[in-house]
Amino acid sequence: MNEVMKTILKRQTIREYKPEQISDEQLEALKQAALRAPSGRNGQPCHVRFVQNAEMLKEMNTDFKELVGYDTPAYTRWDTNPVYHNAPTFIVLFAEGESYMDGGIMCENICIAAEGMGLGTCIIASVGALFADGNE
């Protein structure tokens, strides 16, 4: 079995992360994986942001809790387990219009690249509500 297939089969959702930030080299590789994702008619309708600022991540977590209303048991545990699972790098994808397929391809490129570097990932679709007004 080739290395690409091994990496794809090895990838799984991870929800616990080490506090150390990824290296600049790893960050650049993830950016390249995102940018090299194919899109329909090469329309490139997706954008990606890499958030590594701890204060911004805390603010995003608070905003998300307020947005969804977290008085249900599933959400109250976020007091100790933020929506981003304490990952030191949080990647946000934006897809224009109905470009969900293109966004999914970009997301998978990032996840497979991360797995190949020994980095865990967790795809969280619901945080898109934070940016519903179009502001990135």
Mark where each language-model region is.
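Acidic, surface-exposed loops and disordered segments
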Residues: 1-136
